[in-house]
Regions:
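Intrinsically disordered or highly flexible coil/loop and linker segments, enriched in small
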Residues: 56, 60, 64-71, 86-99, ...
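C-terminal, non-catalytic "cap/extension" segments appended to globular domains
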Residues: 25-45, 49, 210, 214, ...
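Short His/Asp/Glu-rich catalytic/ion-coordination signatures at enzyme active sites or charged loops
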Residues: 32-46, 94-112, 136-172, 227-263, ...
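Active-site-proximal, well-structured secondary-structure segments within enzyme catalytic domains
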Residues: 145, 149-151, 171, 179-185, ...
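N-terminal signal peptide
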Residues: 11-26
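N-terminal helix-rich structural modules
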Residues: 25-209, 645
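Short pre-active-site segment immediately N-terminal to the catalytic Zn-binding motif
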Residues: 470-485
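Classical eukaryotic N-terminal signal peptides for Sec-dependent ER targeting/secretion
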Residues: 1-11
Length: 697
């Protein structure tokens, strides 16, 4: 049933989109020359002035709309676009709040973007502003893209609560939104600052068994080894640590980050979201959150995630049993003796199995991936695939000395063969990217792409930042290389989709949220491509290129664990969904109890007892709320989009250029279903996802 639901939703959307595509055209608004960059290196007074100026400018534009009725839809939208551009500093402030090393700067940045969010919420609850904006009713705009922007404007008013009957109710909606914003920020910042550690003597051979000597040496001070809950540390311990007690300890520390404070924060956020949904007439917050996504309803999301979980259940059990055999042998147990593969066991025994059954030596493999060669490989692959050129910039002020800066150009010096360009035909930059790639104290702990500025034709170039926690020195895991490709995909979507956009709302990664991950998930396949890896993966000691035999082993072994990983993703999706479908105000509601209940039904791992607090560090509950399902929904789309590349070649110029210009470059100017139809020529089949879930390529 899940495939039928997913197929019917996608087919319906794409069928509608085919008509809209003809009406709208597949190119963004024609470009005009863009203005210069702003420096990303700012201090507290500079940021505060910039933020105050943005609010002052936006307020003056809004006042002008209230004071004088726009002559038509296009004039209204131009004024609203000016407000959007002015408020764009909030995105940059949000980035700084997550990555800046100075606490005072992080606090100022937080204050800035919260103030901007609160201003925007008040604006879309302002009846006078709404009445000016809605005065045109069903009148047509000058073109299809302007019409789409106008429809989005009215939708934003509706979803903000403008239809509430009284000023008192609208004021209450404002207070709910403001409190959610503040609590979500507190949740995220608590995670960023909550780094936990484990220490032991450097000569504790039993505890440190299996860990790379170089890793141990790098973590030793005065005879004491200190391991943190930062991802590079925990990843290494889970994969190579022979001590189950060490793995369990690190898992417990990592999965308890944020607790107990974030447990109380989450409870309050869930209560506020429930109240928000009830206030606006939705049965629950999940219904509100999914209404503007491709999937359409929370019930469709529930059916989809349950179906994916069911189809992978048998394969996940088979994968787990293969690991149980290794653990039994490790523990000296008889064949068939009951034994569990705990969550902190999986990576260790999977690494052992891949070595034994697929001839994949993970330690050997990691020596072919260092940050610098991985970076050059990703840049080279992106340049070929998206027909771009990257130039390193030095001397550009940033928030930290480790941040790398690149300007982005069309490869041809014009627009790469794809039509109008903000380069203005002069070969100038079309955007800028920042790479903040290594762990440090109080920095965002995960991997993500952040907006610095959205591209707006004739106003500003797109700027984006990739934030990760990869090791600066020492080997990288192949999984980290895959993450590099994934997040760089978002960065390229932001830059390419920011070209020629008249309306800021449509710039960059601006499609429906459950399409957003698809381009990046597709790009993960390049991290397994032999031509791509052979172009940069060289041994850190000898400089020899990665052997084809090792690459073949990597590709064979990559299939193992897919079912378990997918079921775990569906567990996360169900936690995300169910926490927002259930009433958190009923007596006895407990988010941790809900997560435990769902773990029993969906997680491939047994319960870990009371020594972890997963929901306290499930950061997606803040940003994604009910829609974590989007990762697997996007995977279905990614696998469909990958098929033309498999037929023509991963770097086929025609296919890659069509993909760049038909899928990425429109940004949000067209519905995601239109982008799919324009590239594939038909509704995407779920057959590719089905094969992928079954372990095929």
């Amino acid at each position: 049933m899940w495939m039928a639901v997913a197929a019917s939703v996608i087919t319906f959307l794409v069928t509608l989109a085919a008509t809209e595509l003809v009406e709208a055209g597949s190119s963004p608004v024609a470009a005009t020359p863009a203005l210069t960059f702003e420096d990303a290196g700012v201090d507290v007074p500079t940021l505060s002035r910039r933020c105050d100026k943005a609010l002052e400018t936006a307020r003056s534009f809004a006042d002008a709309i209230r004071a004088t009725a726009p002559a038509g839809i296009d004039e209204l939208l131009t004024r609203v676009n000016d407000i959007d551009v002015a408020l764009g500093v909030g995105a940059f402030a949000s980035l700084l709040s997550e990555v800046h090393p100075d606490e005072k700067m992080r606090d100022a940045a937080t204050s800035c973007y919260l103030g901007i969010d609160q201003f925007a919420t008040r604006l879309y609850l302002d009846r006078a502003f709404y009445e000016r904006s809605a005065a045109f009713g069903t009148a047509a705009a000058a073109d299809r893209l302007a019409q789409r922007r106008y429809e989005k404007l009215l939708e934003d008013f509706e979803r903000s609560g403008i239809g509430l009957a009284t000023a008192e109710l609208r004021g209450h909606a404002q207070s709910i939104s403001d409190e959610i914003d503040e609590l979500s920020t507190n949740f995220s910042h608590k995670l960023a600052s909550d780094t936990r550690t484990f220490s032991c003597a450097a000569d504790d051979a039993d505890t440190l068994a299996g860990l790379d000597p170089a890793f141990v040496a790098a973590h030793t001070t005065d005879g004491v080894v200190t391991i943190t809950t930062d991802y590079p540390d925990t990843t290494h311990v889970y994969k190579y640590g022979r001590s189950a007690e060490l793995r369990r300890t690190m898992y417990g520390l990592s999965r308890s980050r944020g607790a107990p404070e974030n447990l109380a924060t989450l409870q309050r956020v869930l209560e506020l979201r429930w109240e928000w949904a009830q206030l606006l007439g939705w049965p629950h917050y999940a219904a509100y959150a999914t209404a503007t996504k491709m999937i359409g309803t929370a019930e469709h999301a529930d059916t989809f995630t349950r179906g994916v979980a069911n189809i992978t259940a048998a394969a996940a059990e088979e994968e787990t049993e293969r690991l149980r055999r290794l653990k039994r042998a490790d523990l000296g147990l008889a064949e068939g003796a009951p034994v569990d593969i705990e969550a902190y066991d999986w990576s260790y025994y999977a690494t052992q199995l891949r070595a034994r059954e697929y001839a994949l030596n993970a330690t050997e493999l990691s020596h072919y991936f260092r940050y610098e060669n991985a970076r050059e490989g990703v840049l080279r692959a992106a340049a070929r695939l998206f027909h771009l050129r990257f130039e390193r910039r030095t001397g550009v002020p940033t928030w930290h000395e480790a941040v790398e800066v690149y300007d982005v150009f069309w490869a041809s010096g014009g627009d790469g063969g794809g039509g109008d360009s903000d380069a203005g035909g002069g070969g100038g930059p079309i955007g800028r990217i920042y790479l903040d790639m290594h762990p440090r104290a109080d920095k965002y702990k995960h991997a993500a792409q952040f907006t610095v500025r959205d591209g707006v034709a004739g106003v500003q170039l797109p700027e984006g930042c990739l934030v990760t926690n990869f090791p600066l020195e020492g080997p990288m895991e192949h999984s980290q290389v895959t993450t590099f490709f994934h997040e760089f995909g978002h960065l390229m979507h932001h830059v390419v989709g920011g070209q020629g956009q008249r309306w800021k709302l449509f710039s960059g990664v601006a499609t429906e949220w459950d399409f957003v991950e698809a381009p990046s998930q597709m790009l993960e396949e390049w991290a397994l491509d032999e031509e791509t890896l052979r172009s940069f993966a060289t041994h850190d000691a000898t400089g020899a290129p990665i052997p084809r035999e090792l690459l073949a082993a990597l590709r064979r072994a990559a299939v193992f664990g897919r079912a378990v990983s997918t079921r775990q993703q569906m567990y996360y999706a169900q936690v995300s969904l169910q926490l927002h479908m259930r009433d958190p105000t009923v007596p006895g509601f407990d988010a941790e109890a809900v997560a435990a209940e769902l773990a029993a039904a969906f997680s491939p791992y047994p319960p870990v007892g009371g020594f972890t607090h997963f929901v306290a560090n499930f950061g997606h509950l803040m940003g994604y709320s009910a829609i974590y399902y989007t990762y697997m929904w996007s995977e279905a789309i990614a696998q469909a989009m990958l098929q033309p590349f498999k037929r023509a070649g991963f770097y086929d110029p025609s296919t890659s250029l069509r993909y760049r210009d038909l899928v990425l470059r429109p940004g949000g100017a067209l519905p995601a279903a239109s982008l799919l139809y324009s590239f594939l020529g038909e509704p995407p089949s779920l057959d590719a996802l089905h094969r992928w879930l079954r372990g095929g390529e």
